[in-house]
């Protein structure tokens, strides 16, 4: 099987063309491939499939390193767009794809950055899903001896965003896994730790569902900005600084789609016998 290794700000992927190759990935195989000592090693596996709808270009599937399939990965979407152009699967600059939960348009700019229409953030608890009586800008959550204030949103996948004074000292290693599997998130959640520098700048660390802390999380950056705007902390255009680099996020508020712009890097091509 041929594949490419790619990353978006250090969030790394194994990307596989399932348009011209016949492939099947069991959870066990994905876990073996994800092993950084005995396999290829990655945060997520991205699979390019033929479109389910003739109006679209491709179907986009995402698997975490633990073998679970998820509906959204923003950094992966940028790498997906670069991959299909690099491999000659399309020469379009605006690429329409379906995912497990919806549709996306991926736009490759002249300088090879990728702008992704991530759709409209969804704050309805049952759509996240999140157990709450009604939608709120801020929720109180308790986990063991910890009590935190957070925002909750779906960007096609569930996110919990906590504002912190300093991301460097944030309790990512302890609070991350506690909140990821909290009973109020029936499908688990990605946990973002956001430091607001000013209305146009945030620093962010993300503990990703099924992957742990990563160098960058595109949908997590989108979620953090959406929550920050809803809470009145941020303006419509925000630069998000993650351990792996920076993303530009734009959201004009409820009723509008959110856009993410950032790089996608091709590292190498490989071949593996399964």
Swiss-Prot record:
Positions of the record's site feature: Could be important to modulate the pK values of the two catalytic cysteine residues: 159, 208
Pfam entry (one): DAP_epimerase
Compartment list: Cytoplasm
InterPro entries registered for this protein in UniProt: DAP_epimerase_AS, DAP_epimerase_DapF
Catalytic center residues: 73 (proton donor), 217 (proton acceptor)
Binding-site list for substrate: 11, 44, 64, 74-75, 157, 190, 208-209, 218-219
Job description of the protein: Catalyzes the stereoinversion of LL-2,6-diaminopimelate (L,L-DAP) to meso-diaminopimelate (meso-DAP), a precursor of L-lysine and an essential component of the bacterial peptidoglycan.
Quaternary structure and interacting proteins, as annotated: Homodimer.
Name of the protein: Diaminopimelate epimerase
